[in-house]
């Protein structure tokens, strides 16, 4: 088959492309930049450009829509709508133009509220979405667009994967930032670290996306997180131990952390610079952000890696020479 991956030069897209290439599929890796790993399969195009999407999808059988605007410091915030909602609409336009009937779409658990309906087990797919930020709102609106598309033709298949924070070699998201701060000795635990986090390793995420090719006609919605969840203290301790340090390191009261975050927010507005610390990042760091991923077991998918395997691999690839005190 010929398979298109929007965001195909990203770290999830690259891992997925490797699995698909191994099976002999032809790829169209659509991104704003050329794939370093698969340059011959790259198509430079912007998901916000409808004509470019239609041209890029010529001859495609299946679309993986991974491209998104997801940073939490985007300005203007309207870019979330432009890229995530408008980009999704353009992908659908391309699917209709070329008679493509299968779309696999990565959404986000940011569509759920910070406080889940089931605090013990986390939000599941039956719970009412209630996004807590502009990013989550845009992903929910994009989901609705794809949900409408799948009902238009009985031959259509939609797999929507609500992803938690995903980490792995090559990623420069929040988990990398945390690891980098720990490795450089600049990290201090905010709060007592008892809050739990649902996270996922890129090797498992790409494996499930690959597995999603086997799902039949209709609409399929899944939360994805690698289990069991870790609390923040255990998570930080695991990273520190992999870097040759003991324990969770220094700690700061939550109220003091919020005050510090507000100072950085003011500085960001005055200077126009982006800082690694903000109120929203501190709140997210200290909150329980867990989801229920039990439903995914119905697909018979088995994650090939444990969370420990994933953390060890990322630290080995990104920080193996780092031995600074923390």
Language-model-derived ranges and their functions:
Residues 291-298, 302-326:
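Amphipathic terminal alpha-helices
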Residues 202, 237, 260-301:
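Conserved C-terminal active-site "lid" loop/helix of NAD(P)H-dependent oxidoreductases
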Residues 90-134:
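Conserved Rossmann-fold NAD(P)-dependent oxidoreductase catalytic core, especially the SDR/UDP-sugar
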Residues 82, 117-166, 190:
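Catalytic helix-loop patch of NAD(P)-dependent Rossmann-fold dehydrogenases
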Residues 212-276, 311-315, 321-326:
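Mid/C-terminal beta-alpha module of Rossmann-like enzyme folds, strongest
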Residues 3-23:
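N-terminal Rossmann NAD(P)H-binding glycine-rich loop of SDR-like oxidoreductase domains
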Residues 36, 47-86, 94, 112-114:
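NAD(P)H-binding glycine-rich loop region in Rossmannoid oxidoreductase-like domains
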Residues 141, 171-177, 191-213, 219-220:
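Substrate-positioning beta->alpha
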């Amino acid at each position: 088959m010929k398979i298109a991956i929007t965001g195909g030069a990203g770290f999830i897209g690259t891992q997925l492309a490797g699995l698909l290439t191994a099976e002999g599929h032809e790829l169209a890796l659509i991104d704003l930049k050329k794939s370093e790993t698969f340059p011959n399969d790259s198509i430079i195009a912007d998901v916000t450009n409808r004509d470019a999407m239609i041209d890029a999808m010529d001859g495609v059988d299946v679309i993986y829509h991974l491209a998104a605007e997801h940073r939490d410091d985007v300005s203007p915030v309207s870019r979330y709508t432009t890229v995530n909602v408008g980009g999704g609409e353009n992908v659908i336009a391309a699917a209709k133009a070329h008679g493509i009937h299968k779309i696999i779409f990565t959404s986000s658990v940011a569509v759920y509220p910070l406080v889940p309906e089931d605090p013990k087990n986390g939000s599941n797919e039956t719970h009412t979405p209630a996004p807590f930020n502009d990013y989550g709102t845009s992903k929910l609106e994009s989901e609705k667009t794809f949900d409408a598309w799948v009902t238009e033709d009985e031959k259509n298949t939609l797999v929507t994967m609500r992803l938690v924070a995903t980490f792995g070699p090559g990623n420069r998201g929040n988990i990398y930032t945390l690891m980098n701060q720990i490795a450089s000795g600049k990290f201090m635990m905010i709060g007592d670290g008892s809050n739990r986090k649902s996270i996922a390793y890129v090797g498992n995420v790409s494996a499930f996306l690959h597995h999603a090719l086997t799902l039949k006609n209709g609409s399929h919605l899944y939360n994805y997180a690698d289990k069991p969840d870790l609390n923040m203290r255990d998570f930080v301790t695991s990273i520190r131990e992999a870097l040759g340090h003991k324990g969770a390191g220094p700690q700061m009261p939550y109220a003091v952390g919020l005050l510090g975050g507000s100072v950085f927010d003011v500085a960001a507005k005055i200077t126009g610079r982006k800082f690694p610390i903000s109120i929203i990042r501190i709140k997210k760091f200290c909150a329980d952000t867990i989801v229920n991923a039990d439903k995914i077991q119905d697909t018979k998918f088995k994650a090939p890696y444990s969370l420990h395997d994933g953390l060890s691999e990322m630290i080995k690839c990104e920080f193996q020479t780092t031995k600074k005190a923390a």
